[in-house]
């Protein structure tokens, strides 16, 4: 990112602020909305994904820990559906790792094509007012597998994953359960970045 000029840094900061507002309100969607605009500024997703991953780690962990403390004191009910979360992770973890491997090894042009294609499909569902829903157990399995892979490749698998989680997790627990899921999936991605010696852009996290 050292080659960027001031106005590009300013645009990146504004996009990250916007994605943070979306994530804090919905619990998901910040990356999917921000990544296309970031790639217009610089087309290397490996630059932005470590920073986005760090934001997810900090935001999700602080939110869940705060709510967990309230639940422990009896002020609120437990906010994480651990049982379903564990079952979903067993399905998603291998596709997730395959997606991360693809992100690290595939050419940037191919990764960008995948990202823009997926976001284009998401956009079409919005324009056509079509809600992504999983109505059968087989569809649940496919959504979690594909969502896990997309999450590994680009962190934008949330719409597919949420379609499944919203069926089995109560509305009260959904947001925090998703935050724990993002935290675990992002830890896998960041660990892979470290192993692959990818620049985590630590100075730019500030």
What name fits each language-model region?
Residues 9-83, 143-152, 156-206:
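Small-residue-rich hydrophobic segments that form or flank transmembrane alpha-helices
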Residues 46-127:
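Membrane helix-loop-helix hairpins that form the core translocation module of multi-pass transporters
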Residues 8-12, 84, 88, 112, ...:
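Residue-level signature of transmembrane alpha-helical entry/exit and packing/kink sites
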Residues 44-45, 110, 136-138, 170:
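Membrane-helix interface segments
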Residues 115-117, 124-147:
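Alpha-helical multi-pass membrane helix bundles of inner-membrane/thylakoid proteins
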Residues 1-3, 74, 100-110, 132, ...:
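Membrane-interface helix termini and inter-helical loops of multi-pass transporters
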Residues 4, 28, 51, 92, ...:
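A generic helix-loop boundary/linker signal
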């Amino acid at each position: 990112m050292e080659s960027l000029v001031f106005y590009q840094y300013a645009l990146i900061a504004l996009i990250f602020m916007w994605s943070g507002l979306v994530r804090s309100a919905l619990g998901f969607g910040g990356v999917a909305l921000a990544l296309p605009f970031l790639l217009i500024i610089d087309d290397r997703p490996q630059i932005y994904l470590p920073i986005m991953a760090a934001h997810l780690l900090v935001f999700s962990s602080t939110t869940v820990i705060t709510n967990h403390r309230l639940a422990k004191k009896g002020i609120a009910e437990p906010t994480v559906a651990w049982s379903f979360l564990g079952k979903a992770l067993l399905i998603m973890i291998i596709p997730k790792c395959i997606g991360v491997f693809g992100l690290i090894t595939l050419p940037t042009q191919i990764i960008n094509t995948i990202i823009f294609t997926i976001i284009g499909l998401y956009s079409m569902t919005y324009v056509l007012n079509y809600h992504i829903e999983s109505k059968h157990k087989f569809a649940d399995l496919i959504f979690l597998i594909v969502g896990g892979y997309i999450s590994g490749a680009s962190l934008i698998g949330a719409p597919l994953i949420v379609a499944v989680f919203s069926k089995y997790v109560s509305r009260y627990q959904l947001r925090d359960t998703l935050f724990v899921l993002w935290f675990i999936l992002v830890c896998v991605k960041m660990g892979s970045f470290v192993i692959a010696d990818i620049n985590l852009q630590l100075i730019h996290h500030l």
